[in-house]
Amino acid sequence: MKVFESRLDIKSEQYKKRRSYLLQLLSELNLRKKQVIAQAPEAVEKLLKRGKYPAREKIRRVLDPGEEPLEIGLFAAWEMYHDIPGGYPSAGTIVQIGRVSGKLAVIVANDPLVKSGAWVEITCKKNLRAQEIAMDNRLPII
């Protein structure tokens, strides 16, 4: 097998600047991800008292043990709907791809902690995209 050698100079100033910039961008992305996923503890507690679960927890319970799902559209509705207090994180619906009984599936769950699961235009688009991904990849959708 042919070995490819890199000409990347990790000691160059250009590399160091670009690496630093990339790490800064990754840090911002991770911060935004935490903001989108964060849920008010009192709202979660209230939901649990009613015998219900947040959307990501519902999906986690359906997935095979130890399965790490791929989330689609985490940033849907990011910085949209400024007129709605709290915005519409992930467009109020969670879409993940993961294994259920050993087979890949697209799993969709409406988030009851985002405006009680109400839909807006972008929620419809996200659900249609989930169906499209499932059809294109011949995956069941749950």
Spans of features found by a protein language model:
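Terminal-region recognition feature
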Residues: 1-142
